[in-house]
Structure formats: C-alpha cells, structure tokens
C-alpha cells in the first residue's frame, strides 16, 4: 500500500506492491484516484531532503517504483505542472457567473442586509414547479441522483426526462420534506459509496426504531379492538344463541311464521306506468346470440381460415374454459384412483386436503427467520467454537425448508467443534439415512467415550446382531457405562444376558438394577449368592432385601409342600434391623409404596411382611388407630386391596375389640373378597366383639343372600344367645322368616317379641304381617293396641287410616287422622293424608283449609307447600298455584323439591332461567339435579341428560323415583348394556324413598317383589301419568 498526498491537502491510498508495479501503472492509478491529468503529474517522495523525481516516459514501462526508493507505506506527493504563455487570457462573458456554482455558505442578498423568509416553494405547492436548468449543462453532465438513496436513472427514466425537458416542466419532480420543493443543496452531487453506506445506516436506524415496542403496540391495539368488539357486538353475535335454537323448529312451525311485507308501499304514490314495445332489432340480436351455427363460411374454407376477419372472431367463454379444466382434473384424479399398477404417488382422495394443509409462510415469519439467520451467523463468526450456535443455525435453515443449507451449517459445526457430541448427533439427525452411519462413525472416532454417540450408532442399525456388535464395541471404550450395558442386555437372549450381566456387575458394582436383573436370571441357589454379593457391595440399599424376600416367596409358590411365608417375614425383619444398624432412616411412606409395588407384581406375602414390620414406625400410640384406618382407605382408593387388607389385619391384631375396624375390614372383604373370606372374618369378629349387633346381622344377611337360609337362621340364634334383648336381631329373624314365606314362624317371633315388651316397630311389623295375610280384624286390633301403648308413633296412625280408606270407611279414616294429629301435630305425612282424604270427599276448599292450618303449625314445611300447589293445579287454578309457589320459595328458599316443581311449572322458554336460579340456591340437591336432567332430555341432548341423571342418582341413591326416571331414559336412548347397568346399580343401592316408589313398593301385591320388578312397575306408572297429562 502507497499513500498519495494531492494538492487539495487530502491523502489517498493505493493498494499496490512497489516491487512489482511499474511507473506507468502507478501514474494511471494516481490519475484515477486524484482526477489529475496524467500528462500534468509530477511527484516526489516525502523524506528529510525531498527530491523531485523525473522519469522519461520511454522508460516508465520498465522502471519499478522500488527503483525510485518507494517502499510499502511510503508517501508520494503529487504536484501539478503549471504552463504559462505570452498571450492574455480570453475575457469571460459578462453574465458567466449565472451559469457557475455559487460558493459554499452563500446566502443571496446577505451583503445588503436581507433576511431569510419562507415562501411557497419551502412549503410545497400542489404541483412541483418546473425546473429550468442550463441546456449546455444538461447536455454535458450526467443526470444526478434525486434525494437520499437515489441511484443511476434507467433508460426509461432518461426518456421521461427528455420529454419533460421539451415541455420545460418536470412532472416527475419530487418534493423534499426537509428542503421544500428544492430537492436539496446536494441535488447535483454525485451519489458515491459513502452516501450509500449512510443511507443504509439511516435505514437500519428507522427499522430499529420501528421494531421497538412493536409487540407491545400490537398487543395494545389488539386489546383495544377486542374491547371495542366486546362493547359493540355485531347484530349477528347478539342473536347467535337464538339462531342456534332455530334447528328445533318443525316444518309446520316454519310455515306458521308470517311473512313481513313492505308496509312503506302504502305511503308511496303510484306513478304512471308506461310500457314500451321491444324493438325488433333487439329480438333479432338475441336470437342470433342463442343460435348454434353448424356450417362454415365457404370463403373461410377456400382460404384455409387465413382470411377470417379479426373483428368477427367470437370471444372465448372463460367460464366454459374453467369448467373444462375442472373436468380434466377430475378425470385425471379418477384415473389415478383406479390405477392398480402401484406406481402413482398421488392420493386422489386427499389431494385437495393436502393442498389446503400446505404451510403458508407469512412475511413476519420470513422476517423473523432472516433476523435469526443473521444473529446466528454473527454468533458462529464471532465464536466458532460454540456448538450451540452451529446447531441453532442449522435448525433455522431446517425450519425454513433449506435442508442442504442446514447440513452445510452443521458440517461446519462438526469441523469447528469436533469434540462435542451434540453437534455430531444433530449432524446425524439431519443427514440422509445412507449418510447417517458415516457421520456417526466419524463422531465416535473423534469422541470414543461418548455414550450418546454409541447409542445413536446402534439405533441406526436394523439388524439385532449389528446393534449388539456396535454396543459391545462401545463397551470396549466405556466399560463402566450402565446405559450401554442395559442396552446390550436387552438385545441378548437369556443365556447371553446372564453372561453379560456377570461382566456388568464387575464393571459397575454399585448399580443396583444390574444386580437385581442378574438375580432374576439365575437359579434359586445362584440368586441367593448374587444377592449376598450385592448386599456386600451395597449395604445401605433396601431393595436388595425386598428382592430377596420376593425370591423366597416365589420359590415357596413353586414348591407347594414348602410354605416360605414365615421365612419372607424373617428376611424383611432382618433387613430392616440391618439397615437401621447401617444408619439408614426407615421411611414409612416409602416402604408402604414398596409394599404396593410388591402387590402389583404378585408378591402378596412380601407386601404383608413389609406392612407388618413398617406400619407402626414413626406413629404415636394414640394416633395409631386413626392413622392406620386412613392409610387403608387411601390404599383402597388406589386399588391396592392386599395392602389395605394387610393394614387392617395388623390393626386388628393390636385393636381386637374395636368394632369400627372389624366393620371396615368386613366391608373391604364384601367389596373385594370372597364369601368364604368374609364369613371367616365375621366369625372371628363376633368372637372378639360378641355385643356388636351389626356384625351378627351382616353375617346372617350374607348367608341369606348366598341362599343358605339355615346357616343364616343359626347365626341369628347365636346372636340372640349373645344379645337376648336386641330388637334388631328379633326383627332380622322376623324378616328372614317372612321373606322366605314362613309367615307362621314370623308371626310367632313377633308374638314373643311383643310379650318381652317389644317396641313400636314390633307392633308395626306385626300389623304388616296380618295385612299381607289378609286378617283385617287382627290387623285393626294390633294397631289399636299398639296405639294405646305408643300413641305418639305416627306410622301406626297412618296405617290405621290407610286401613279404613282401603275399605271405604272414610269417616273412620278421618277420625284416625284427626286423632293422630292431636298426638303428633308436627307429623307432615298425617297432614298430607288428611288433606288428600278431604279433597276426595269435600273438595278443594276443605283441603286448602287443612293445608293452610298445617303450614301455620309447621312453618318451613316444603312438602305442605308443594301439596297445596299440586292441589290447585289439579283443579286448573294455575294463577293461584303460581302465587303459592312464589310464597313457598320465599318461605323455603333452599328447598330442592319446590325449585324442581317451579322448573316444571314454568313455560318452556323460561325453564332454563329457572334451572340456573335453582342451581344457585341449592346446587347439591338431587331434586334440582333430576329436574335439569329432564330439561336436557326434553331438548334431546342425550349425553348431557345422561350425565345429569348419573349425578342425581349419585347424590340421592336412596330415592327410587330417580332410578325409575334414569331407567326410562335409557329405555329410549340407551343400549341393553346401559339399561342393565342402571338396574344393577339400583339393586345395589336398595332405594326406599320417593313418592311413586313408596306407593308401589308398599302395596300389598308388591310386598315380596324384588327391586328390579318394582323399578319396572314405577317406570310404567310414570309412563301412564305422562300419557294422561
């Protein structure tokens, strides 16, 4: 490089080598850089004693710069030769200054005190003012760039400028926002590289300023748009919910909708209507347009069509052309679909779907990818040893669909970071399947200790033997890699796996899984040896002791003559003590988790041994019962039945006389055990807790359900011997005999119970037996005697009144109800029965008065309000019923039966609103839930209705009417499996309440009917009631 010092004081540089550059070449370069004519150039070196250098032009092509003493970084001073003469200079024209450039910082009129002002040219007119430059200057000078960033004009723009010059007006003149209509001081300046670089910098600054807070501005704008749309919804959105309901309208309802007419026509004045006949020319033209020409013009045939007049050529029908293209595409797809050669790669059925699913790249995504590409390019250039930069750059190219560029980037990453395994893994992923093996081979050569690379190399192999060979090669370099050992063992057969595991435990003696896997593959004797070695290497590992216990249990199962259950318990006990000596903290929760894991793999004895030895660790003595019961419940919820059974067994060994634990254990056996295990548990329970009635009764019931009536009778006799004065046992014995059609034995048992001073329930059961046997007088006698002893037991008064009603003795029935209300004034069933009787005999007014009296004596009685409302509805007093309903809801705002009745009474459009109000007041009430389910049923929303029916029977399983409605729903919309499931659940819940259910189940003809039969009869009753309504 040589520096040039030119006359205007600037210093330029020329990239030349003085040892190889001649004088003539240097003069040409100096001329190009300084614009000084080559013939006027004179130069000298900058030294302490500078000397002028003169070189003959003949020798300039052979003399080098170094011959003149010029070296690298020397400074050559350029001089311009001035030539003088004897002749005077020619005079300049008088007005020549008008065509020359003004000096810098020139302000017109400044010398005479003029000041600046603003004109229209500064602001900018509506049209650009004409530019009248000098023609001679335009002819000789090149057209300058206009404005910032303008380049060299094209040929089309030059032609436009020539036309504007002829018009003396430039129509394409631009307006500069800073300099007004004048395009700037540098309008005629040359647009060089510095200007281009400055424009690029300013453009990048503008883009940067525009990108700042762009996401925040866009999010704010989006939020404002959403707020505006939320506050000003469209009409279609306001009526969207109503439009959805239009599909429920039938065809007749659609036809009944009146047509809206244009009533504005009434106010319009009728104008005079004039009719003009169509001209014949128009009709003739239309006829010709529809006409189909089948013959050619003779002239056109003679000339071969070359003389066809252009104007008479018909216009192409573009619609028909488009339809034809669609037909051709359809035929092609049909041919492809019918192809049986198997060589086509087109799926004609999914062709259009694939076109729709093609990813469209937006401008924003392209911009983001370009930015990311530049960022990662800068990262890889500044820090090429960072593998993450190369991986990220390759993935950017991959996302952009440029897989070749991605492979190139990751290849460079492998070259720059050959010791990084992630780069090689990424290169393997991006490579072709046939090249991936070569890539991973290079990686393992450079990084032979990388486990990931060896595993990836094995994954690329398709043959099991090749996979195993690769993994074994990796183990030669990394013998202590557990992952490689596991992978190679998984691929080997049982014999090879045993050999490999022997070597694996030698290389990795502190890894438990390898020891356990080896113990499972060995024989019983060898497994014990392996586990002993593992215990020596890992003395603080509890899993070894658990595996030893499982091994002992499994060996005992194989050898039926040798029961190793006791040995399993000893192993676990010894293991816990050994671990405690080693300083291992026995975590009760972890050991219980291990017990559940043992249960899942079938090692029940090991599970029981773990629970027995660890369940009491860390539990206070006073908290043992509560903690153990809670643990058993949690295990039962998780499905760990054997673990829960082991917890109950250990708890019962500590708390032998706790009835609640025996009962929970019995319930567990009833749900998940066998009849034999339940019977054995109950026998053991009544041995330790003989005074527990519920345990005796449960044992007798299980025997009865199993069909063993004599065994059930024997259990009740033992219970009677243990608890002679227990009413529950007397009644259970009565029920057993009565349900098995032994009325005489049942009557005898009840007689003995009455003699021993039986309670009111004994007298009621006695009357029920006589009612079913048809002994009316005996039934009446028992009821009267029972009422003398227990006058406040309302059920006896109800039975007496119902007895008189059955035989149409209405006065005696009224007298029985009245007398019962004197003794039981707050018994709502008695008030309801009396009101129903009065409505039948004396009409609505009497019943209304009785119900009003009942409500005064029993405030807050929702059943009384409901009875009054239904009485009004039966007599078509809908307005009075609605009035009573409003008062009832004010008096009982939390009553579910009132809200359910209110939903059913409401008109169809208002039922949804009523149901929402009801759910707000009493969400968990089963009556409201069943009312909502019926709404969905009416709207034919089957799945929602089924979900709400299931919710109702879950909340109120004791109400038989809900099960009947659910079964009726499944009869219409469910399958046979659904109906069987509903019946099974109903039988399991044994419902006893419900208006229809109680009326039908307590009828004399249904006394001994099973629950399934009663369920179907309730459904029939509901269907009849619906049809009659």
UniProtKB/Swiss-Prot annotation:
Record has Coiled coil as a keyword: yes
Pfam family, one: TPR_19
Source species, domain of life: Eukaryota
Cellular localization per UniProt: Nucleus; Nucleus, Cajal body
Coiled-coil residues: 210-243
GO biological process terms on file: gene silencing by siRNA-directed DNA methylation; mRNA splicing, via spliceosome; positive regulation of primary miRNA processing; response to cold; seed germination
Induction remarks: Up-regulated by cold stress, but not by abscisic acid or salt treatment.
Positions of the UniProt region annotated as Disordered: 142-170
Phenotype upon loss of function: Lethal when homozygous.
Repeat positions for HAT: 367-399, 401-431, 432-462, 463-494, 496-524, 526-554, 639-671, 673-705, 707-739, 741-772, 774-806, 808-840, 842-874, 876-908, 940-972
Gene Ontology CC: Cajal body; nucleus; spliceosomal complex
Quaternary context: Component of a pre-mRNA splicing complex. Interacts with ZOP1. Interacts with PRP31.
Misc note: The sta1-1 mutation causes the stabilization of the normally unstable STA1 transcript and increases the expression levels of miRNA target genes.
Described purpose of this protein according to its UniProt entry: Pre-mRNA splicing factor required for splicing and for the turnover of unstable transcripts. May be a U5 snRNP-associated protein involved in the formation of U4/U6-U5 tri-snRNP. Involved in responses to abiotic stresses. Involved in microRNAs (miRNAs) biogenesis by functioning in primary miRNAs (pri-miRNAs) splicing. Required for DNA methylation and transcriptional silencing through the RNA-directed DNA methylation (RdDM) pathway.
Protein name, UniProt field: Protein STABILIZED1
Organism whose genome encodes this protein: Arabidopsis thaliana
Record lineage: Eukaryota, Viridiplantae, Streptophyta, Embryophyta, Tracheophyta
Gene name, Swiss-Prot/TrEMBL: STA1
